[in-house]
A protein has these predicted regions:
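Conserved class I S-adenosyl-L-methionine
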Residues: 62-71
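Class I SAM-dependent methyltransferase Rossmann-like catalytic core
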Residues: 27-56, 60
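Core SAM-dependent methyltransferase catalytic element
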Residues: 208, 223-249
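A short acidic, Gly/Pro-enriched loop at the edge of an enzyme's catalytic core
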Residues: 63, 132-143
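A short glycine-rich, Lys/Arg-flanked "PGG" loop and its adjoining helix->strand segment in the class I
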Residues: 80-81, 158-173
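A short SAM/SAH-binding and catalytic strip from SAM-dependent methyltransferases
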Residues: 129, 140-158
Length: 249
């Protein structure tokens, strides 16, 4: 690298980091002041760091994205604010997740969140995550938050492979699959604890043809030794979590 090129690269880095920080700060402020956003969501932001997480994934205005296994839609609303009025968010939940007592609660939470058309750029997608029914190459990004481990809690050993194949189909070239999950230890039976092993996620992604574009320690918590279920009162909400940015070639 020539001296001029090196100097330009250094200057660019000086501008890039503040801009990223500004983007995250702006989204944080927007989420805090969002009218009608649940108070519990706003309280959770400090520990979940959604603005910084989406900044790491590179998700921004005008993008078309999907919130996978969205449940009541915490990240759906975060994404809706991040992509803005010129973007679009699909809120995906499997039909089976919207039945029974728990499903009824989820459905009510969704209806409350979307009431009055307050998230006009959000469209519900009640389909299985391995069969989204969206056009090929139609998404800029997909986010699966604290749910990737569910791909392993399934009798079908091909569940993860089918999911990743669908992600490759619907993402544009260069599109991002962002994964956030509770970290598990190698050798543990992580399924019952609702955890996932980072190396296992990375191996599955590589086998499916994704590029690992980076990992983040933003949500790491060394005080969690990963031996307890994520619902244990001593660590609920503050588990050790990994963040992975996967990219479709």
């Amino acid at each position: 690298m020539t001296r001029i090129a090196l100097a330009l690269a250094l200057v660019a880095s000086l501008f890039t980091l503040p801009v990223q920080a500004q983007n995250a700060a702006a989204l944080t402020a927007a989420l805090a002041s969002a009218e009608g956003r649940p108070a519990a969501d706003k309280e959770a932001d400090a520990r979940r760091k959604p603005a910084e997480t989406l900044d790491f994934f590179g998700i921004g205005p005008g993008m078309t994205v999907v919130d996978l296994i969205a449940s009541g839609g915490y990240y759906t609303e975060v994404l809706a604010n991040a992509v803005g009025p010129n973007g679009k968010v699909y809120m995906q939940n499997a039909p089976s997740a919207l039945t029974g007592e728990r499903g009824t609660r989820t459905e009510q939470a969704i209806n409350d969140r979307l009431a009055g058309g307050r998230l006009a750029n959000v469209e519900r997608l009640n389909r299985d995550p391995h069969d989204l029914g969206l056009p090929d190459g139609s998404l800029d990004a997909a986010v699966i938050a604290l749910e990737y481990h569910e791909l392993y809690r399934n009798a079908d050993p091909q569940t993860e492979a089918r999911f990743l194949a669908e992600m490759k189909r619907v993402l544009k070239s260069g599109g991002v699959l962002g994964v956030i999950d509770h970290a598990g230890n190698a050798g543990n039976d992580n399924g019952p604890m609702h955890r996932a092993e980072l190396d296992k996620v990375l191996a599955g992604a590589a086998a499916a043809g994704f590029i690992v574009d980076g990992t983040s320690d933003l949500l790491r918590n060394p005080a969690d030794d990963r031996s307890l279920t994520v619902f244990d009162a001593s660590i609920r909400g503050v588990t050790d979590q990994f963040i992975v940015k996967l990219r479709k070639p």
